[in-house]
A protein has these predicted regions:
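A short, hydrophobic beta-strand-centered structural micro-motif
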Residues: 34-44
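Charged, amphipathic alpha-helical segments and their flanking helix caps
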Residues: 1-30, 43-135
Length: 135
């Protein structure tokens, strides 16, 4: 049994960077990351053993962060449209290491303000649910 979160993270990283041309970080962004970037966060998975392998229900959150006094949510929502166009229920996921993705769905899309309104941070969180199997 391999950790399915590793392969799904690699797949999302590649596809998000391609769809948005933004820097994608794993877990958190470093100090000075810039004004627009994406963070892959909130990865969870549960596993069921079947007759011929494992089935994993995976959840991953794509956190789109924009910092600018002039844009508000408009730029973050424009980026979220790029993400949702590239990665949606019709997307086929190809993974390595014997994993096969059978389902991809969007659980939620949420706007989130920064902790301090004076920071002018605007975020859109997209949570995906994926079912993958490993034989």
């Amino acid at each position: 049994m391999l950790n399915p979160n590793i392969e799904i993270k690699k797949w999302f990283y590649t596809n998000l960077a391609s769809a948005t041309a933004l820097v994608v970080y794993d877990g958190f962004a470093p100090e000075g990351a810039g004004n627009e970037y994406i963070v892959l966060t909130g990865r969870t998975s549960t596993q069921d053993q079947g007759k011929e392998g494992y089935t994993n229900s995976i959840s991953i959150t794509v956190d789109i962060i924009t910092k600018n006094a002039n844009f508000g949510y408009k730029r973050a929502e424009t980026i979220s449209d790029l993400v949702l166009t590239a990665i949606n229920s019709d997307t086929n996921i190809t993974l390595a290491n014997g994993f096969t993705a059978s389902s991809l769905s969007v659980e939620s899309v949420r706007n989130l303000d920064g902790l301090n309104p004076l920071d002018n941070v605007f975020r859109v969180l997209i949570t995906y649910n994926i079912i993958i199997t490993q034989i």
